[in-house]
Amino acid sequence: MKIALITVNTDNFDDVMPIPKQSVDFDFHCFTENNLPKFEMSKRLLSKYPKLMTHYLLPDYDIYVWIDGSIEITSEFFIEEIIKDLRDVKMAKHPERQTIGDEFNFVLDQMHVDNPYLLERYTIENIVRESLFINDGNLPLYACGIFARRNSPEVNRAFEQIWGQCQIFGNFDQPLFSLIEKLRLARFNSSS
């Protein structure tokens, strides 16, 4: 089984930490503006491409493990644990908010009080449009900074759905993972 550990770091936004030796074999891929495709889109959206469309960039792997650029792996069993009992997609539940409705409300509340981090990434209009599109605030909220997924036609199509919606609504992908689970486009299980 071939495993790819993937992250993105454009404009040296994060300090990508060294990956400790793991208990399973893997290849590490860090995408930057130097090795990302040259698409006409914002850097923020372009940085989502390896996260969501990995199967086009690295088609010869069986499993992809995603980590945000700011995440530091400290355990030698990290990859072994996250791929253990993997169905299609494995993510942790969000540690602070339970549902995507909670997340939409949190983001909108923060944008209304001029949170600069959110205002430079999203628009209120697109957040509202995405919320109306999903139309189910009770879906579980996942923490999308770390996940594992299979490279299979079904899962790839599900991630292509997320990519397509990110292009329509901006780059707020977090609630879209819950939507593909609801639509049964991919089978999820949670990690801790």
What are these regions (language model features)?
Residues 1-49, 53, 57-63, 154, ...:
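N-terminal anchoring/stem segment of glycosyltransferases
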Residues 2, 26, 89, 143-145:
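Short, surface-exposed beta-edge/turn micro-motifs
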Residues 19-21, 55-57, 82-85, 136-139:
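A general structural signal for short secondary-structure junctions and capping/turn motifs
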Residues 30-38, 44-53, 74-85, 113-134:
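Core catalytic alpha/beta fold that binds nucleotide/phospho-ligands
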Residues 31-33, 94-95, 191:
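Conserved beta-strand termini and adjacent loop/short-helix elements that scaffold enzyme active sites
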Residues 62-72:
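Short beta-strand-to-loop acidic/aromatic patch adjacent to the donor-nucleotide binding site
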Residues 73-113:
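Conserved donor-nucleotide/metal-binding helix-loop-beta segment in metal-dependent transferases, i.e.
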Residues 115-192:
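Catalytic core and acceptor-binding pocket of nucleotide-sugar-dependent glycosyltransferases
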